From Swiss-Prot:
Binding partners and assembly: Homodimer.
Sorted UniProt keywords: Cell cycle, Cell division, Cytoplasm, DNA-binding
Functional note: Required for spatial organization of the terminus region of the chromosome (Ter macrodomain) during the cell cycle. Prevents early segregation of duplicated Ter macrodomains during cell division. Binds specifically to matS, which is a 13 bp signature motif repeated within the Ter macrodomain.
Record-level Gene Ontology MF annotations: sequence-specific DNA binding
Major location (coarse): cytoplasm
Stored InterPro entries: Arc_rbn_hlx_hlx, MatP, MatP_C, MatP_N, MatP_N_sf
Organism (species): Citrobacter koseri (strain ATCC BAA-895 / CDC 4225-83 / SGSC4696)
Lineage, opening ranks: Bacteria, Pseudomonadati, Pseudomonadota, Gammaproteobacteria, Enterobacterales
UniProt record, GO biological process: cell division; regulation of DNA-templated transcription
Record-stated family: Belongs to the MatP family.
Name the UniProt record assigns to this protein: Macrodomain Ter protein
Length: 150
């Protein structure tokens, strides 16, 4: 496992995930009967600051169909959490107009690279082009100076 699991922190994330799904109208419990489901959800809502009991609630009451999605969400959140600790791994976001994103995504796909790798490559290409233009300009000036002296 690449990222360390922090039980207390992740229990809080699981609690928030389940509460969010409940508020969005998803069935978060394994119970078909409405009163049993409501009772289990009410219990969950009281467990915000009790990580051990949140995990026990998940084992006992959670809808099994939700388990995989929750694991994926927590795994992604764990990755973002640990990547945010270091400047070089911290993710940044930029706003792009749809057409710009579409063109960039197409270019990245054709090159078989990620969006970030494609952007870096485009920047490097532009820098090389600037260097080349500067060298050509200097060469041209030197050549004109040589020809002008004769």
């Amino acid at each position: 496992m690449k990222y360390q699991q922090l039980e207390n922190l992740e229990s809080g994330w699981k609690w928030k995930y389940l509460v969010k799904k409940h508020r969005e109208g998803e069935l978060i419990t394994r119970y078909v009967e409405a009163s049993a489901a409501k009772e289990a959800v009410d219990l969950l809502l009281t467990l915000e600051n009790e990580p051990v009991r949140v995990n026990a609630w998940i084992e006992e009451h959670m809808n099994p169909a939700l388990l995989n999605r929750m694991k994926q969400t927590i795994r992604a959140r764990r990755k973002r959490h640990f990547n945010a600790e270091h400047q070089h791994t911290r993710k940044k976001s930029i706003d792009l107009e749809f057409i710009v994103w579409q063109r960039l995504a197409g270019l990245a796909q054709r090159r078989g690279k990620t969006l970030s790798e494609t952007i870096v490559q485009l920047i490097e290409d532009a820098e090389h082009k600037e260097k080349y233009a500067s060298k050509m300009s200097t060469l041209k000036q030197d050549l004109q100076a040589l020809l002008g002296k004769e």
